[in-house]
Amino acid sequence: MKTRWLLFFFIIGIYGILKGQNLNLSNSEQALEDRWIECDLLWFKPNDIRGSVDDYFSRISPLYGNINGEKGIVLNPGWMFDMVACWTGNLDDQLILPTFSMPGHQYSSWTGKEFRELVKTIKSSASKYGFNDFKVAIWFWGGPQLYDLEKSEWKDRHPETYPVYNLRYQSPLKGDKYTYAVYPNGIPNGTPFYSFFAKQMADFSKATGIDGLEMRDFMTFRHSYEVPPHEWDEDFYQGVRSFLVELKKARPSLLCIGYNSAGPATGDLRGQGFDSYSLASNYLLDHYVIESWGVAWNDFYKPHIFSCSYAAQQAYLAVTQAQLAETKCRVLPLVELTGGWEYDDAPLTRSRFNNRMQAWLYANTFYASRAGDLSPPNGFSLAFADRARAMEKNSLISEDQVSFMKATLDRASMAAHGVEKAYGCRLFYNRNGLLWMNKNAQGVDLGEYSDFHFSFLMNLGITATSSARIEDFSKENAGDFPILFTPFQVPDKAISQIQDYTKKGGSIMIIGAKNTIDPKLKNLPNTIYWEPPLNDGKNFANPDAAEIATKINNVFKASGLSFQSTQQLGLWPMWKSKGVNYMQIVNFQYQIENAVSRVYTINISRKQLGLGSGPYHLEGVYDQRKIGADYTDKDILSFRVFVPPFESFICTLQPGEAPPENTLINNTDPRIVYKGDWKHNEMALVSFNQDEHFSANKGDYAKFTFTGSGVSVLGTKSDNLGYADIFLDGKKVYTVDGFADWSKEPSIITSAHSTNFLKDYLKYVVPEKQVLYTVSGLSKGSHTIKIVVTGTKQAEASDYGVVVDAFEVKNH
């Protein structure tokens, strides 16, 4: 279909937007959300506190603007506990900070008084920008060391804190003779670590003005994909609880910020007995950060193994929202700020599609209450404002990156807070069942991890954006298609609601082993049952998931709901906000080395979305370009969408016709004349149609004659390509420089530590397709464009090649 061509050019066309043009929001528009931004203490200077704070807000303040939720900064004082654990209580003493094993990258010396002045200056500077009640928190990672880059004095003093590498809160500390704020004469022998650290943290926050503690990666058990012995996880959870109780008792106003360590939310409870709901409902947790990694980890590490796929992280978020619903705890997914994170992940940020995609995915993941009311997450936690993790300790992320991320986050959040409908599947979380399994089924393989299986279906083209609690099941909050996981230990009222729903024609799906399904919920009408093979929680590639996804699509089709025509990997969440239907299409990949472009066929139900008759088209959210129309009056609108690997776009569904479609001519079209020794490459993964023509021989040319008002030449820029001359109707009009070294782009400059990772990532993922030349406003009639290999190149280029992928003919 022609839709394919125009959608392809939408993908190519918005590269210009992603390279610097940003959406400007009206001052009257506000994102109804919290926004916390992480920054390494390395950025701030004790000998120039005011200057470094002013520089921070001068650069980063736009990210806090137009936000009417909570605003704050989370300072990273070297990951380890040292700053607080070794706190003497004397503001004139030097604070203990971890040391780097890497020379020349050490923290400055800070006294308690200087750190207090830093906190005070941050708050006063924030108020000058109109950010009242601005919060300052610190985080700790909790391990004995990290990446072999930081060494902890606390670990040297008290290695018994880490009996099995992981922190053990209830570890009895050995007596010592050091001076501490709460024990001036040394820690008494046998003092539990949780008690000592809670008292130290309370004293430190009072003395310095710190408002919160983020328990980064030491909030939940560190084996998030395993089932530890029950006594281990019980000991860990009770230690965390005891710490929070003691901390809140000593410092009630201190914000306690949890952090889930990138593990599955069901795994925390079912596998390890970590009951975040109990903590939050007892006011021990104020915020909960979902380590959803909005670029880093998601692509580079093989996502089917490391559970870092886009779908997996969205599923984790959805389950966490259901876990913490009805509490006061604020849920904040983590999104990376382009260029700000970390040693071997900094290269992954070249494609801003990923930043945009993650922000929209997470902002528009909803929890459905008993009455069916939808609520999004409470905001974002952003990492990092500075580039210390990318080995640039004296630089902040760029103005361009700030501007881009602000526009993205604000727009996504505003769409979320006007939500009226979340289409597709709805995951029903079963807290009682997970608690029972944790206490009674330890040592059993974790095949019932609901977030894993939910993400299987999302990966395979089943639209899903929401979650709910199984005990709240009703026709009001069932959504388009309820998915129930391990439905046993379910209240009788909910069972009755489920039975009634299916008897009256509602379709549902039940996932779980036979012994995890209540007998009253077996053999229901209009129900798909799936008993997924047990797995260790690390391998996503369930062989029968595709068959199940096909069954669901068939149910959708039969029910007059939106569906995907062919079974392909990919996400396409849909929701309705302020009367507008949104769609996001993501080309998910299981393995980087097999990454390919895809064409998705998405079928949209007029009835489901409340659409009228007549033509509809997709419209890009950021450039308002009309793309791909369906001119039929059928009940189902059909759109074909081209998406490169690991990419996505966000659009709305609008009534009316699209403008005349451009025509894409692939490089294999017989109307293109090749002269010389051109090679045909059929493995060009990110090219249109996954192929291209290549030549490095001087004088070789490709010539194309067309009729239209303009034309664009699509090709590749890379580190092995040289110059080509462009001729239009016999006249030289342009010289293309095909050289590009993506590893030197500002957004992905990183240390030598990352070199091998960077090369692999660029090889498979970085989109190299470029508009090499474009012209418009041509006279009516026939025109000829010719691309000639010059046999010359930049000194840095490794070869003289020229690549031709396609020609876009403009018909208007």
Positions of the model-derived regions?
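Glycan-recognition surfaces in beta-rich domains, encompassing non-catalytic CBMs
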Residues: 657-812
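Catalytic domains of carbohydrate-active enzymes, especially glycoside hydrolases
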Residues: 52-98, 203-213, 283, 288, ...
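Aromatic-lined carbohydrate-binding/catalytic grooves of carbohydrate-active enzymes
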Residues: 65-116, 144-152, 220-230, 462, ...
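Carbohydrate-binding surface patches
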Residues: 423-451, 483-489, 565-610, 646-652
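Active-site-adjacent "subsite" loops/lids of carbohydrate-active enzymes
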Residues: 42-45, 49-50, 106-110, 117-118, ...
